[in-house]
Amino acid sequence: MSAVLVLALVLLSLTCVTDAISDACLTCICKQESYGCTQIGCRMDGRSLSCGYFQIKKSYWIDCGRLGSSWEACADDYNCAVRCVRAYMKKYIGKSGCTANCKNYARLHNGGPKGCTKPSTLTYWNAVKNQGCSINS
């Protein structure tokens, strides 16, 4: 019986690992958001401010767990921003009803917690694809 339990835990852990956003997909999103994945600071995006490599909004930063010393500091620190994006994706991919792939991660990043279901985020996905990613990246 314990061998079955161990096998189940191993399979579950593999599922969790494979559902994580890949480095390749993160890079494509970063390139799209900050003109080649560069530190660009904060900019107005519609009616709200977006900051850093991934153009993270304050509400996104709160949802990712308030990493770093502040929203702007985390967004402008590549490693902190990556941790924030990974945490956000982990939090919402399972709740969104969408499968874990680069297309849906990009759409979540652009459109919020249910972004992968919004037709308006398909244009963003096409822009991310143009940065060199595919659905399976």
From Swiss-Prot:
Pfam family, one: Destabilase
GO MF term set: lysozyme activity
Signal peptide: 1-20
Domain I-type lysozyme, first and last residues per copy: 21-134
GO cellular component terms, A-Z: extracellular region
Compartment annotation: Secreted
Binding-site residues for substrate, renumbered to this chain: 57-63, 88, 109-111
Record: active site: 33, 45
Main localization, broad class: secreted
Paired cysteines (S-S): 25-102, 30-37, 42-51, 64-84, 74-80, 98-116
Enzyme class per UniProt: hydrolase
Gene3D superfamilies: 1.10.530.10
The reaction(s) this protein catalyses: Hydrolysis of (1->4)-beta-linkages between N-acetylmuramic acid and N-acetyl-D-glucosamine residues in a peptidoglycan and between N-acetyl-D-glucosamine residues in chitodextrins
Entry EC no(s): 3.2.1.17
Superkingdom assignment: Eukaryota
Keywords, sorted A to Z: Antibiotic, Antimicrobial, Bacteriolytic enzyme, Disulfide bond, Glycosidase, Hydrolase, Secreted, Signal
GO biological process: defense response to bacterium; killing of cells of another organism
PANTHER family per UniProt: DESTABILASE-RELATED, INVERTEBRATE-TYPE LYSOZYME 2-RELATED
Role of this protein: Has bacteriolytic activity. May play a role in digestion and in the host defense mechanisms against invading microbes.
Family that this chain belongs to: Belongs to the glycosyl hydrolase 22 family. Type-I lysozyme subfamily.
Protein name: Lysozyme
Organism field: Ostrea edulis (Native oyster)
Gene behind the chain: lysoz
